[in-house]
């Protein structure tokens, strides 16, 4: 009996641990959030850019039918009408094709899933043609009725966990995930996505759902589809949106036993550092000492689709594409540092925080336009196509699991470190030049700085760094240069 219990416990532990695995293809790391992109465009991006540049995954916007709202704001995607795969990004056939094409080039798909709630009042018509009556909690496209929702109440006090989890977030009709029928419908929806070949989920508004209910839902999910290259028995990677800056009734620690969490403290802290409110020298103990969840439970980012607009957490400290020099430095640090599972943001430009993606006619999403230097236009920012970011994804892949070594700082805002003997980075956020002989940890030779340029054959389009037989190199980063970071690695050796 004891042996049987032990086996059951070990089996449960194996299942639990499996959902912390990103399911990335070997030798790849780092995902990108292609916010509001169309499925056909993502498929092409996987084949033409993400795959060749070593990206491991793509987070996509919600895939299921949402309410059509006036002026088509981005947040309409977070107001579900049904679980039909029909949105402005495309239909089920297009989504299935995208997942297959991305998997074929080693890029995994992670879906932003919304099942805390359904649409708020006014969301009577959906992108797939379904109708609903949010005011009476009737969503025939699922179908859900008033029996499937929590009683109507507002969230006014984040120190009351019951209110946060049982009441309505900004008027969105709050589903009761403890209801077995709701659980059935959610599992059916997620399992369908698993059948189509996705690798995991970002669970929207997880903080507003009871961990015990989520545990039931996650525990019922089928294993990943081996036809898409996943190992037998693999579980979906789960990352839960839990905004925990401290001082509230709900803690991320209630969720880290179930999956990874969106570590908003990382975003807030990295913004403060590279905006000059904290010194770079303090980054020497970056990680859990800063109040972050454990590395394998932390999805880390510089900004996300919410907090780049002032929603969520971080406020004015959050760095976005609108502060490009510091944004590139913070992104390079995140990708160079071994902590967490990094996610790169890929935005559309906005001046109004409600503004939706670029369209051709006010409704249909426009495709990004690509320039000769890899950057985007047509209203798309495409931070993932900035050389300083995509070359650091390659850096992360090159250094693998090698530890941080050879830490150096000037007691202020100049730092450098190596990742074992495979990569080296230096940062200058002071208002004077960095000019020092530093230990890179790398083998002797000439290396291409992958921030100022790229390795092209046996030459470099940017600066080069000469490493001596002792591993040292003269590192220069002028305070007025376009980039306050320099990076070299073994795959960029000339």
From Swiss-Prot:
One of its GO terms (biological process) is carbohydrate metabolic process. Ca(2+) binds at residues 116, 165, 174, 208. Gene3D superfamilies: Glycosidases, Golgi alpha-mannosidase II. The active site is at residues 204, 241. Disulfide bonds join 46-102, 153-167, 376-382, 448-460. The record marks 306 as: Transition state stabilizer. Transmembrane segments: none annotated. Keywords: Calcium, Carbohydrate metabolism, Chloride, Disulfide bond, Glycosidase, Hydrolase, Metal-binding, Pyrrolidone carboxylic acid, Signal. Pfam families: Alpha-amylase, Alpha-amylase_C. InterPro entries: A-amylase/branching_C (IPR006048), A-amylase_C (IPR031319), Alpha_amylase (IPR006046), Glyco_hydro_13_cat_dom (IPR006047), Glyco_hydro_b (IPR013780), Glycoside_hydrolase_SF (IPR017853). It catalyses: Endohydrolysis of (1->4)-alpha-D-glucosidic linkages in polysaccharides containing three or more (1->4)-alpha-linked D-glucose units. Chloride binds at residues 202, 304, 343. Its cofactor is Ca(2+); chloride. SMART domains: Aamy, Aamy_C. GO terms for molecular function: alpha-amylase activity; metal ion binding. SUPFAM superfamilies: (Trans)glycosidases, Glycosyl hydrolase domain. CDD domains: AmyAc_bac_euk_AmyA. Binds 1 Ca(2+) ion per subunit. Its EC number is 3.2.1.1. It comes from the Eukaryota. Belongs to the glycosyl hydrolase 13 family. Monomer. This is Alpha-amylase A. It comes from Drosophila yakuba (Fruit fly).
């Amino acid at each position: 009996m004891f042996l049987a219990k032990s086996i059951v416990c070990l089996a449960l532990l194996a299942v639990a641990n499996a959902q912390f695995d990103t399911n990335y293809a070997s030798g790849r790391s780092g995902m990108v959030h292609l916010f509001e992109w169309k499925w056909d465009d993502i498929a092409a991006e996987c084949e033409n850019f993400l795959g060749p540049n070593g990206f491991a995954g793509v987070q996509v916007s919600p895939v299921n039918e949402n309410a059509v709202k006036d002026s088509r704001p981005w947040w309409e995607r977070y107001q579900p009408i049904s679980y039909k795969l029909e949105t402005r990004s495309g239909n089920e056939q297009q989504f299935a094709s995208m997942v297959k094409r991305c998997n074929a080039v080693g890029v995994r798909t992670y879906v932003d899933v919304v099942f805390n709630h359904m649409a708020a009042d006014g969301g009577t018509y959906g992108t797939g043609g379904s109708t609903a009556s949010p005011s009476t909690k009737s969503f025939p496209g699922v179908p859900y009725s008033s029996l499937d929702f929590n009683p109507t109440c507002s969230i006014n006090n984040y120190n009351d966990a019951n209110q946060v989890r049982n009441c309505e977030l900004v008027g969105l009709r709050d589903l009761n995930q403890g209801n077995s029928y709701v659980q059935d419908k959610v599992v059916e929806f997620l399992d369908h996505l698993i059948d189509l070949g996705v690798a995991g989920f970002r669970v929207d508004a997880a903080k507003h759902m009871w961990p015990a209910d989520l545990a039931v839902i996650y525990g019922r999910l089928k294993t990943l589809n081996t036809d898409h290259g996943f190992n037998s028995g693999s579980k979906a990677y789960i990352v839960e949106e839990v905004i925990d800056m401290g001082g509230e009734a709900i803690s991320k620690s209630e969720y880290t036993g179930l999956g990874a969490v969106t570590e908003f403290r990382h975003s807030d802290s990295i913004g403060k550092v590279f905006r000059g409110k904290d010194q770079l020298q303090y980054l020497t103990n970056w990680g859990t000492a800063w109040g972050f969840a454990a590395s394998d439970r932390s999805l880390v980012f510089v900004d996300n689709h919410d907090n780049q607009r002032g929603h969520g957490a971080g406020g004015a400290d959050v760095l976005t594409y609108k502060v490009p020099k510091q944004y590139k430095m913070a992104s390079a640090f995140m990708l160079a540092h071994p902590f967490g599972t990094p996610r790169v943001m890929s935005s559309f430009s906005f001046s109004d925080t409600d503004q939706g993606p670029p369209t051709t006619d006010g409704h249909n999403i426009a495709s990004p336009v690509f320039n000769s230097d890899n950057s985007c236009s047509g209203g798309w920012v495409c931070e993932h196509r900035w050389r300083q970011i995509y070359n650091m994804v390659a850096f992360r892949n090159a250094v693998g699991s090698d530890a941080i070594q050879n830490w150096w700082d000037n007691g202020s805002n100049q730092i450098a470190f190596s990742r074992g003997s495979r990569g080296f980075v230096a940062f200058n956020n002071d208002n004077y030049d960095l000019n020092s002989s530093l230990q890179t940890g790398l083998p002797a030779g000439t290396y291409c700085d992958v921030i100022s340029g790229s390795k092209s054959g046996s030459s470099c389009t940017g600066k080069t760094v000469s490493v001596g037989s002792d591993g040292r190199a003269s590192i220069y980063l002028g305070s007025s240069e376009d980039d306050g970071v320099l990076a070299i690695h073994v795959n960029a050796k000339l």
